[in-house]
């Protein structure tokens, strides 16, 4: 079995920006690198591969890890920053300088869900080939039976769109109706006062401008990732090791770290990615959302060299960050690499100011420029106990049908036996309030000869609003005393995420996927009333999520109208509609 050195150094693929770092070979020679390091690059291996581990670079990487860990001690912050700058600088500079003289490599392949990497035995003292995403002829070394496969099971739902490009021009007519304000924790006046009276004047005192230095621009334009591996430890509960600076963490992990755990949660912050062992997370007891879970134990055990990855987000990402102190590693790594790119004089100038602000505690009393999660209107409404018109209309118009309620039927054997046909049958259902009302409150037409009715006529007057945490909480709160009421709410969030809640007497039925703005489980726990049935759609793409939500609405109509027992509906939903059932019950 190949012995894996988790702290081994590496050489990643060259980029134009790093190729010119430190102004080329002349400065590299002036730094007087160790002889073994220079001898390696003067005598490359026959196949041109970057395979030899430099002792100096290995030691530098170890020093960097030690300096990162030292930040958790009560050391002087200035000493920590300077020490880490030196140690990380040695490691990163070695890699940067080395890459300036690498032989050209093949073009990086397009992203894919699987990757075959070397698992053959390497000679002693030789590092495994770099897994930086470049194409290589692996057939020379191994056959398919020896391959290691990595799959990155990213959430296929389209992420929140953020326009990052700069328009070439804009007119007043185009912009007059666009609101560019961001609601911040601190007031605009406080933030403006800080930048006007302290931030800008201090920086204006720096007069040593180096117009020829391009380190900072090169650093900010880099597209690689600092990769950390979070794994079990025999001594401590867990350990975090710095792996490599690579262009593709999936290929690198699959090639060299699959023995740690072949199921991995990936936490990404800008240029830093943490590869967290699935088994480690399970042992900690952190709740894993169903939509972000990895494959089951049986699938993982089929091939230990096939790695499965999930890019985590939202509440789960925050939980992992807090438990493993990933914010500390991110801040330390980002701070050190950023200061190094500024150069010695600018770095010293800023460190002096930061240390001064740390000593007088000014650093912790500055206006915090964090945007609020919800808009000003929602915050104002919440503070003034203002009930959303959408929620008010639902309660108002559902009162008029309280005597009719949902159609009440005995369980129907035909419906139970033909659930798959009935639920998956094409229909004219849309995610409008009136359309869903027709589905839930009128007799479900599983046969063409079933007579409909107009139970939902009044509900067609309800005007739907965009979804938010505020509206969900209001809907539940307004139903506290409405014990025998029958009503429902449909909400659309960003990225076309959907949430449907239906109430029948003292039971709520939830249909949702992964929603960034609302954690349904937490909302229910906070509400702490009645019985709640949750149908959570697993991770699928947007189109499939929409189809599954519509099919679950049809299934919900059958449940509410008594045509299908809840137990049969749950079994069908989990087996046929790719969703997970959860139940919450309170006294």
Swiss-Prot record:
GO BP term, example: viral genome replication
Role description: Regulatory transcriptional protein, which trans-activates gene expression from early baculovirus promoters. Can also trans-activate its own promoter, suggesting that it is autoregulated during normal infection of insect cells.
Superkingdom classification of source: Viruses
Record key words, sorted: Early protein, Transcription, Transcription regulation
One Pfam family of this chain: TATR
Protein name: Trans-activating transcriptional regulatory protein
Family named by the database record: Belongs to the nucleopolyhedrovirus IE-1 protein family.
